[in-house]
């Protein structure tokens, strides 16, 4: 499994994952959501809360300009994380990391800092992602 990690304090965000890209996808699958026209996500293990699923969908929407063949489905085969080392926002960046690495593209940097007062990681660029 691949791994996404952010560590800027005594704790971090860590998500292990396996994702498969299915090109010319046939849209008759359970646990599948259309996140934008002709772009789908399928959860093999339906283990995401609504907030995490939202950030995953936003991560997928953020890369649609780079998709060359439609329809496409991103099948989330496995996801593993410890709730002590997790924030839902991590799903956005985990997907982007996977996509860019899978397509031999440079992974964009992540603007993040740890806020000691709220005991959370803050992702300033995700404030503008609400519209996606």
PLM regions: where:
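Accessory interaction regions appended to the cores of large information-processing enzymes
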Residues: 1-132
């Amino acid at each position: 499994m691949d791994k996404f990690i952010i560590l800027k304090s005594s704790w971090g965000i860590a998500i292990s994952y396996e994702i498969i890209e299915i090109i010319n996808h046939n849209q008759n699958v359970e646990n599948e959501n259309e996140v934008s026209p002709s772009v789908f996500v399928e959860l093999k293990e339906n283990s995401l809360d609504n907030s995490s699923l939202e950030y995953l969908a936003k991560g997928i929407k953020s890369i649609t300009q780079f998709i060359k063949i439609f329809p496409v489905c991103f099948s989330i085969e496995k996801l593993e994380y410890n709730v002590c080392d997790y924030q839902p926002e991590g799903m956005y960046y985990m997907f982007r990391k996977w996509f860019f690495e899978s397509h031999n593209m440079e992974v964009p940097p992540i603007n993040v800092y740890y806020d000691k007062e709220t005991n959370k990681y803050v992702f300033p660029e995700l404030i503008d992602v609400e519209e996606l």
